[in-house]
Amino acid sequence: MTKKIIALVGRPNVGKSTLFNRLSIRKKAIVHDLPGITRDRKYTDGKIGSFEFLLIDTPGLEENHDSMGARLMEQTTKAILEADLICFMVDGRSGILPNDKLLGSFVRKYNKPAILVVNKCEKAFDFDKEYYKLGFDSMVTISAEHGTGLIDLYDEIITKLPEEESIETNIADPIKGDYLQIVVSGRPNAGKSTFINALINDERLLTGPEAGITRESIEIDWHYKNNHIKLIDTAGLRKKSTITESLEKLSASDAINSIKFANTVILMIDALAPLKQQDLNIASHVVNEGRGIVIVVNKWDLVKESKKEAFQEEFYYQINTHLPQVKGVPVLFISAINKQNIEQVLDSCLKIYKIWNKKIATSKLNEWLNFTTEAHPLPLQKGGRRVRVKYMTQTKTRPPTFKLFSNNPEKITDSYTRYLVNNMRDAFDMPGIPIRFTYVKTKNPYV
């Protein structure tokens, strides 16, 4: 028996994301005074009292007939259809607005169990009987920010969705356990959301020609070739110097934080926008965090056939020149909107993930080390003594990290370390991931 689904619905800035965070067991939504922050359906495991459920945060609904408004309405409508219970939220400070009446009627026409949640009621006298005119048979007053009124909300929820029918205590949580966490990152308007929608074959994420549509990191559970995958769409990352709005700073921070906890990062690049320093900055950040990386050039269908060969030649040159620390990184050319080569991206992610987790036997490591250092020894130091790397062992995976023992580690140059790392990539088939070396001084300096 699966968990019941509760959707939070209402006009912008009534506190849906604040309540989402209050009820969420794990992932948090961005909260800001600016209305309309949420633009995609956002899911989390929720809990109130002993009652556990799947919670959906939705875009704020407005009477808006432009293209963006229609796409936001589509996202919310899908959440309503998916939900077992609707929490229709209004603002207790501003009172009932015309949009509340219109949207209340819109929600009620689906004949789903619903609760009118009057938020921002920090004081008892905030309650207004006018709210009954919205036509909902159940109503509670709460303050999502301060956590008041949640007991009343709990009582109404279990009345609408009896607890014994909603929870299976022995059921495995699909979020927990072994899964591959893939973050899709890149500059604005590279096609990140379109790519994920194409993969899962669902208009799950809001897309459009406007740059910067995605404002929060959105997690989507998915399965591919018997692998449990969590896809994470992130806000587009611009240069720090161009970010002035506080909301964009929050979105950028959310995206950067997602990279920190990723297993593999897909760096999405727009084929119509030449490779920029910001793309390389994002890639370097991924590598510095020790994550696996797959570089994807999107909108390949829009590049003229006569220019593709020269484009690829220059692109590979730039990547190899500026990202030598992940030599051999997979580069794929796709069209997300046409679903061209998109499965190859996932196959590359699975391969990179396997390499990222690679464990090499100590005996094989030292056999390789002896051969490699003898083939290209470090130069003699003053007094005729040679710096030697005598022994190594792997200390961790994710990414592969190695400890090397030397009689004089401070004399080992960066260029020699690059030589060892690149040789190791070839010897053990480890392209496209960061490899980390740390040096330790042996107790006997003459060894």
From Swiss-Prot:
GTP 1 binds at residues 10-17, 57-61, 119-122. Pfam families: KH_dom-like (PF14714), MMR_HSR1 (PF01926). Keywords: GTP-binding, Nucleotide-binding, Repeat, Ribosome biogenesis. Transmembrane segments: none annotated. Residues 4-165, 180-357 form the EngA-type G domain. One of its GO terms (biological process) is ribosome biogenesis. One of its GO terms (molecular function) is GTP binding. GTPase that plays an essential role in the late steps of ribosome biogenesis. Associates with the 50S ribosomal subunit. This is GTPase Der.
